[in-house]
């Protein structure tokens, strides 16, 4: 599996990449935005998922407990799954 796989259930957002699997309760998600910075957000407590090099798009998922930054070349498909 090269890219990030995103699945949405009624209760959570499941993000899989390589051997990692992150489950985020939908009730904890504050916002999902595109991150326009080159290297990702400047915050230190962000969990970065995906390959930071050779990707052109970044998606920031802010939650109550933790923020996640997805590095991808398939922004539209991932955003469609998240916003479905």
Swiss-Prot record:
Pfam families linked to this entry: bPH_8 (PF23491)
InterPro entries, per the entry: PH_SunI-like (IPR055365)
Domain of life: Bacteria
Family indicated by similarity: Belongs to the UPF0457 family.
Designated name of the protein: UPF0457 protein BCE33L2961
UniProt organism field: Bacillus cereus (strain ZK / E33L)
């Amino acid at each position: 599996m090269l890219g990030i796989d995103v699945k949405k259930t009624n209760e959570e957002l499941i993000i899989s990449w390589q051997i990692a699997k992150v489950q985020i309760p939908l009730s904890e998600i504050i916002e999902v935005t595109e991150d326009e910075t080159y290297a990702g957000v400047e915050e230190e407590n962000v969990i970065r998922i995906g390959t930071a090099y050779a990707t052109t798009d970044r998606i920031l998922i802010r939650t109550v407990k933790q923020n996640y930054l997805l590095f991808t070349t398939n922004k539209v498909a991932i955003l469609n799954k998240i916003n479905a």
